[in-house]
């Protein structure tokens, strides 16, 4: 039975884990790291780079290095947060054919789900390399405050990567699962999750293997990227004040600033001061310019103070929805790389009135929880029940543009709810059902998830037809909506797909692209391996001929030189079969030369005087020896 992997698909970094027996193992990638940068780049030759290899070349290839794409997933191009993001990233954000926010690199447009699928493929390959077998099933985590469109887009990314996504699980819930798995006592816990791009807070009740989410809240556009941006802006402003040059207008300089800002932020979690040194950051008529600046922890904290403070609003809302006070929280778990920042730890400690738990790795705990959930779904782990909630209210637009809720936020999922509505006009034969998600009273102020028509309603006075609208939320938090005319039994149903979203055709095309790329990558790897093998064989054969000049027959030497020339000729092209064929021919010639040399050596050895074996009857004399240890003699 194939294994189910747990993947934390993060904004900045991703992580993959697997359940082995009773233990969970976080799997190291090919570079030996336990987390992988969620970055994808396209080189000049259009080679796709993922993870650390993409991050390494980001400074020299800023417009084609895609990072923090998770912030765009499931969002419309005209979303205000997308507009804000356009001014912060070094790559191009463009409008997709469906109106969603897509990204562009080297003239090619990609859906955020597609870019995320490249990262998921890397995590899948990491697990396969460790397990030595194919992996087809996964549990993938998302921020708890992700809406339906973002969840669906994440599931699509898994499908494009060739994974059957058994469950989409909320990141704080996964962290709680990892934390509470071995805990005997129950209690109320708060999971404070501040990652690279998003913030979540969840309140959970733990007890007897039941993990029940009481409430969740958050901000899907608040995380480490915003903290980095504050440092970037500060450094750029200081440099502009001193040199009169705005580094943010130079994409190469901006990428170097971004790397330096992230490094400085991390260093200031353990030290009080750090130096940022970027030689030759730019140049003007007077010559090259260098950026050398000191940044203290106190200055960093003053730059990001309001961002840390912003996390407390959702915390208050989550406590209120759960019906508990901060003092009633038994344990606070910190998740996400940003929670290593002393200012964040201090703020959480002050708000909840207790020291946060330090016995979980904030970078790995989410992937560990996802792996545990995978084992639960497979039946390998028993007596664990996860009860999650929907983060936002769901409803439809009714007369006057009002948002009528059918399912309130923090309702335990899976869930199903129906309500009967009627027509607004006399003789109305069709109704349009507009589905929204959010907390505002007017529908237009909330997120439109999708709409559909129910037609064929018999003409009747307004208010007479009975139209039953049913919302169904599955365990992944993904919504289906149906509308049924009770008189005729006619029904219309849709799986919500954002206002745009990827169609099944789009997903199928992207799956095929991914498969084609996998085949192309395999072919490229085979060609490189064949070239390396051929080069090595040519070098070895030439060395053999040179070292054994005079010992190889003229015929064999001629054949070897002809075979070497054939290999070199094949290496000038890219025909894999031609290289293999020429290499095979050279291998045969080299083996024959080797055999001839060994044979000649054996014959020469046999002919040498003193090499004969003792004839029968010859006197054999035992040698006398001394045992060094025992100082005994024997004859």
UniProtKB/Swiss-Prot annotation:
Cited Pfam families: HSP70
Alphabetical keyword list: ATP-binding, Chaperone, Nucleotide-binding, Phosphoprotein, Stress response
Keyword Transmembrane: no
Modification sites for Phosphothreonine: 198
Induction per the UniProt record: By stress conditions e.g. heat shock.
Annotated segments matching region Disordered: 601-635
Superkingdom assignment: Bacteria
InterPro entries reported for this sequence: ATPase_NBD (IPR043129), Chaperone_DnaK (IPR012725), Heat_shock_70_CS (IPR018181), HSP70_C_sf (IPR029048), HSP70_peptide-bd_sf (IPR029047), Hsp_70_fam (IPR013126)
Listed Low complexity bias regions: 601-616
Family classification: Belongs to the heat shock protein 70 family.
UniProt function note: Acts as a chaperone.
Record protein name field: Chaperone protein DnaK
């Amino acid at each position: 039975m194939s294994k189910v992997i747990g993947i934390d698909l993060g904004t900045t970094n991703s992580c993959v884990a697997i359940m082995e027996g009773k233990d969970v193992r976080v799997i190291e990638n090919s570079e030996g790291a336990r987390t992988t940068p969620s970055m994808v780049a396209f080189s000049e030759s259009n080679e796709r780079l993922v993870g650390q290899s993409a991050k390494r070349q980001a400074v020299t290839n800023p417009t084609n290095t895609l990072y923090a794409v998770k912030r765009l997933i499931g969002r419309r191009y005209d979303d205000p947060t997308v507009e804000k993001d356009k001014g912060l990233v070094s790559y191009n954000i463009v409008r997709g054919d469906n109106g969603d926010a897509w990204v562009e690199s080297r003239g090619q447009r990609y859906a955020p789900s597609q870019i995320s699928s490249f990262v998921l493929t890397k995590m899948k390959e990491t697990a396969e390399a460790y397990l030595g077998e194919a992996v087809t099933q996964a549990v993938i985590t998302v921020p708890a405050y992700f809406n339906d469109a973002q969840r669906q887009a994440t599931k699509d990314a898994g499908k494009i990567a060739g994974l059957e996504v058994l469950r989409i699980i909320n990141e704080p819930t996964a962290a709680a699962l990892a934390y509470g798995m071995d805990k005997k006592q129950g209690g109320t816990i708060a999971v404070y999750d501040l990652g690279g791009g998003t913030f979540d807070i969840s309140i959970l009740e733990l007890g007897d293997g039941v993990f029940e989410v009481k409430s969740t809240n958050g901000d899907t556009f608040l995380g480490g990227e915003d903290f980095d941006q504050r440092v970037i802006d500060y450094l750029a402003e200081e440099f502009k004040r001193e040199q009169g040059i705005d580094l943010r207008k130079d994409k190469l300089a901006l990428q170097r600033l971004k790397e330096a800002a992230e490094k400085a932020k991390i260093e200031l979690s353990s030290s009080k001061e750090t130096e940022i040194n970027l030689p030759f950051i730019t140049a003007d008529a007077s010559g090259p310019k260098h950026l050398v600046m000191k940044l203290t922890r106190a200055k960093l904290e003053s730059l990001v103070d309001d961002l840390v403070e912003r996390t407390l609003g959702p915390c208050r809302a989550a406590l209120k929805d759960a019906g508990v006070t901060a003092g009633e929280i038994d344990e606070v778990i910190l998740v996400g790389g940003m929670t290593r920042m002393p200012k964040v730890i201090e703020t959480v400690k002050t708000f909840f009135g207790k020291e946060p738990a330090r016995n979980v790795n904030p970078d790995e705990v989410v992937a560990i929880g996802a792996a545990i959930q995978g084992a639960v779904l497979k039946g390998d782990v028993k007596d664990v029940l996860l009860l999650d909630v929907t983060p936002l209210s769901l409803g439809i637009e009714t007369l006057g543009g009002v948002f009528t809720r059918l399912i309130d936020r923090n309702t335990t999922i899976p869930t199903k709810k129906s309500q009967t509505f009627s027509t607004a006009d006399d003789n109305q034969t069709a109704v349009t059902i507009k589905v929204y998600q959010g907390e505002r009273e007017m529908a237009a102020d909330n997120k439109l998830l999708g709409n559909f028509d129910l037609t064929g309603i018999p003409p009747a006075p307004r208010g007479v037809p009975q139209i039953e609208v049913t919302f169904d939320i599955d365990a992944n938090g993904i919504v289906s909506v149906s509308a049924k005319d009770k008189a005729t039994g006619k029904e219309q149903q849709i799986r919500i797909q954002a206002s745009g979203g990827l169609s099944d055709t789009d997903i199928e095309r992207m799956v095929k692209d991914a498969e084609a790329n996998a085949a192309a990558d395999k072919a490229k790897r085979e060609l490189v391996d064949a070239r390396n093998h051929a080069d090595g064989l040519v070098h070895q054969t030439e060395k053999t001929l040179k070292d054994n000049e005079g010992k190889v027959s003229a015929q064999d030497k001629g054949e070897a030189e002809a075979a070497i020339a054939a290999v070199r000729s094949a290496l000038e092209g890219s025909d894999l079969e031609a290289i293999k064929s020429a290499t095979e021919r050279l291998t045969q010639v080299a083996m024959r030369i080797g055999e001839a040399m060994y044979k000649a050596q054996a014959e020469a050895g046999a002919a040498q005087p003193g090499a004969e074996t003792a004839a029968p009857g010859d006197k054999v004399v035992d040698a006398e020896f001394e045992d060094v240890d025992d100082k005994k003699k024997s004859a």
